[in-house]
């Protein structure tokens, strides 16, 4: 079944002259756009916009929405993405008129309630991470990574230590880590993992040196394993004059149990749209605050939100600041949702989040290891990585398993990542799923493993029940069609 056959594009539905909404006649004099804009910016022909009735538009987009899959639709075990349920109380609070109807250009005196919320959120994140200060400016995780690395760069440059041009990153790291380091102007050095899936400390000692600016780590790492040698690694990097950067993508595994700051990390970024239930998966907006230790505070993006006797205010007096990294003060709506979540859960609730996330992951891992290879057989944290190598020998690849899950109304896990595991299947159940849901997914995965043995074609040709089958993902990435062009 082809989506283009079952549901034409809105442009293809257009009927010339069909009007969805009629505007009243203008009661002010008409003006000529040419009096205000250069001719180069004025259309010579009207925009080719679709013409449909309101009913047709409503049906079109309602039907499209039925093709979507999200956390509210079903189980979404996308590894390293923390696709947990987003409580709807978050949406209610974010829609309070006092939050939804304000503007960042208003005088500070008129938005003290909003500033208080942001300040309290910063304070909460300081406590959760063990940092000394937090900025809410970065818009998402990778943006937070880049911002944190720019702070580290500014710190070294301020100290005249310009030879520190290298950032060390594990071979199991998120792809955004080396990308962020490169964009921040650093050279990337890879440190190997050992046979247990952890950073090889001996190899780290070899690559650390006078040119080391920072070591970027995710803890637990992308295999879902806790880096037990983190204190020793922090000492190695600090003795060499470098900084330790924490990728907060996996904070859901340790939140309210241990703090990155207590492990020796100097900079932390968080994903409020993941760990703290700001909705994600649709392209944004997100929120990627960073926390820093005391010696990096002078380099924070301005303005810095502070509390004084007369109220909350933005402080621009940071001469060593790296400057703004986003217009205004971060994605306010996502920050409201994260604050609501933290206040709703409280310290004890956040601890339970971690405990249930880890419990669910270990339960699933043990149930699935009978049918799939488990490269690192040890207690995991919030997620775990299987390998489809056993199925590959039968002619069924990990991508086939992922596509077959669609027929059972499950979103596939992350596949082929981390790169150090062949035919990787990365599963993160999160804390919000019930045992019944986990068991249903486990049964389906075991069934697919059985199909790979007895009827591999049904897996190789999956999905069978979706609106579209297999897309040419390589072509879509290399030759994207990003806008509609009318056939002449």
Curated annotation (Swiss-Prot):
SUPFAM superfamilies for the chain: PLP-dependent transferases (SSF53383)
Biological processes, Gene Ontology terms: glycine decarboxylation via glycine cleavage system
Cofactors demanded by this protein: pyridoxal 5'-phosphate
GO cellular component: cytosol; glycine cleavage complex
Broad enzyme group: oxidoreductase
Sorted UniProt keywords: Oxidoreductase, Pyridoxal phosphate
EC number of this enzyme: 1.4.4.2
Chain's role: The glycine cleavage system catalyzes the degradation of glycine. The P protein binds the alpha-amino group of glycine through its pyridoxal phosphate cofactor; CO(2) is released and the remaining methylamine moiety is then transferred to the lipoamide cofactor of the H protein.
Alphabetized PANTHER family for the sequence: GLYCINE DEHYDROGENASE (DECARBOXYLATING), MITOCHONDRIAL, GLYCINE DEHYDROGENASE, DECARBOXYLATING
SUBUNIT field: The glycine cleavage system is composed of four proteins: P, T, L and H. In this organism, the P 'protein' is a heterodimer of two subunits.
Family: Belongs to the GcvP family. C-terminal subunit subfamily.
The protein's name: Probable glycine dehydrogenase (decarboxylating) subunit 2
